[in-house]
Amino acid sequence: MRLAEQRPGLIAVMAANNETGVLQPWAEVHDLCLTHKVPFFCDAAQWIGKLPAKGLGECDFVSGCAHKFGGPKGVGFLKCPSQGPVRSQLVGGPQEEGRRAGTENVASVLSMMAALKERETLLAETDTQEKEAWRNAFVMSLVGAKILGQGEGRLWNTVSALLPGDCRARWVVKLDKAGFAVSTGSACASGKESPSHVLTAMGVAADETDRVVRFSSGWETTAEDWQALTKGVHTVGRELAG
């Protein structure tokens, strides 16, 4: 109804949240935008390379990030309509049809394309349900913790949990010493002292956000790695409980 009445200039939706891993209904939103003839932008940085990209190419705008699917850091892409008002943020030169000035990093772009092709092939050959089972076993082991977005569809590699007891900094330090690199949020939010706007929007109280720890894995992560992390979390939990 709001789309029909207000006619926004653009609707933007994340395909998968970078802090919690929760999947967003981008395909359904895209269908609504088609019905009401509203341009649609999908931030697919977290989705591409982890889940099939089918349907993303039909969105008006799609962005992706190379290092999320095995490509080099510092390069990404934006798919946009060949026609239409796309205002450049970097001006000065005619590169990329005048939409982004500056010399292209051709080597990184080609590496990104190769990595994406390889990862999409791997996705077609891999049953990610096994990876989901490893993650689910880890989640089930977190007794006393609250999983953010519990019950919702999520990426197979990301878990954001509200842990009991001490502040997250102590969890992160102790787990790091045990050999596990966990975080207090996404890399995009590192260094910020204010509560995450994502967690706030999900109804997490300000005093609870200081106990949220994010766990994520990669394609090479094994069942044994998840099991070792489970033991590490339990050990640290006992230490913090005194």
PLM feature spans:
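Pyridoxal 5′-phosphate
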Residues: 1-242
